[in-house]
């Protein structure tokens, strides 16, 4: 239509947005805006303007009506999956799932219940025609496994025994009696939703693999609409109205009072779309060029293309999204497990507590390396660590809120971790479920149920509803609804609440409860309880997936603390705490931590065999946060090992860290000049190394090294340029007698 605004009253806001788009002030943008601002006219006004030709409006409506169509009719299909000869996607999926079932559950005679569940799930997948989707996700997971990239499926997919058998998820849905209908059912119209967490530092490898495998024209990342927040709205409004950038920045930070006109414009911009970003992990795959369906552009990051639609637009157009998400803790776990497996084979370099750990028997299956999904179960010392809230660096349970809750919850089994992960979330907190659960957990409140039929669904959470799956179980146990209908009820009551669908399902729910002898007042109370916690209930499957990572990171902290802390430091930035705080926590547990050294450190933090006394406060980079004063749980510390801080932890060093490690392969550095010559270290980088204490292995103190850095002129970051000598550091000048740098 060419309209720039919805009504003439929005002209000022439209001008501000236009000026923002042009990156200029409104005065400068007038030439582009013109005197007339087109806007959307109301039907009555259009009729008045076309009074001489009234048929124009009716003909326009006829054309619009005839042009309308259901986008699902032209929705693209998924790429054709590669299957062996003689197989269809469905038969190949059946084969892979049953092969995985034999490995995990044994024969049908040994575990008939598991096989019955798998057959039922495969039947649903076949009826919905989603076999190709599962095969694509499995191919991505298999690629990660082949490349040594740690990944794990999570979310509602953990409710599926088929996903467990395919190796997509680590949660045994049969063992934990999870609801498949929360993930997929015959009543679902859209595709399944499988989120795959991939270690953060290697996710790009997986994304590029998907592009290469399916073709760049047939794959693209989903966009994300970034909306205005108070600060960005204030900055853009001030710039559009011609105010200096310094004033705009100050007002955005709350320093000084912005003019009324600026504040009014900023308020109008709030929550409006500002620009397009990239979804955290969504990728779309199609059997035809994506550009035939929606516009595609190049992303700022090389090698990426991005749709100009967000995930809701993609869903409306029938595009299927795959979520490849990054998770920093998976990077840390992979680093720790890889190093432990390597050290297990070296007699002179292994924690004695872990001798032979890499070939332990797990679940009675054949020998395999212990890793994220194969750790010894229900280790009491892991729960001792959690009960003491000694969880700095541990995934998901290291926040202050989690640390305050853990000693009250006192987890002693894996399901307690599942509950802990779900408990400290905005939903349960807003739904006031946290304190009732903790009171019942400690015996200070009686465990009660609105009706005995609710007990099977709520028994594990002591009568306090926490999970979305519990809503579905209540609907099936107390009212006899099918799993598919129970999932429809959950969706109708969820965050995007549909009063119409909810009322339609309420009749079935109430009738079912009446048939089972539940009186009218109790029926109403049950319905209100369901409606109340549907908004905040956390997915139990999601909590199970994260609980595995909580357990693994806790296990590493207890049994391999040096590798745990080194891996966490090597995976920064992530988590709640700074590197300095993590170092402080390691030292208070008796773990040796030595500062960066140009002759000993790798690029990232590592575990090394060290002899002699602990260097104590050698690492001073950054400021540590205060840590809880409660008791410290004993860890399996190896006195012969130490965490060596990586050169990448030296603030601002950048690519010089890799050059130093590469040059050191020819031999240790003998002097500051030798380091500068062989590793091409600039004087500014040399100063950073000196101030971090990384030159002490050369017999050079921090002040002395910083002074001498000026005499070691090397090429600067810009090619072909040299840094000038600093005053007093020219060749031939002597270093004054400098005192040691104070704390």
Residue ranges of predicted features:
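Cationic, low-complexity basic patches in intrinsically disordered or flexible, solvent-exposed regions
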Residues: 360
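Active-site-proximal loop/turn and secondary-structure-junction residues that shape catalytic pockets
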Residues: 3-5, 77, 649
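Acidic carboxylate-rich catalytic motifs and surrounding loops in phosphoryl-/glycosyl-chemistry enzymes
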Residues: 1, 73-76, 375-376, 596-597
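Noncatalytic, beta-rich nucleic-acid-contacting surfaces in large DNA/RNA-processing enzymes
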Residues: 36-37, 85-351, 355, 364-743
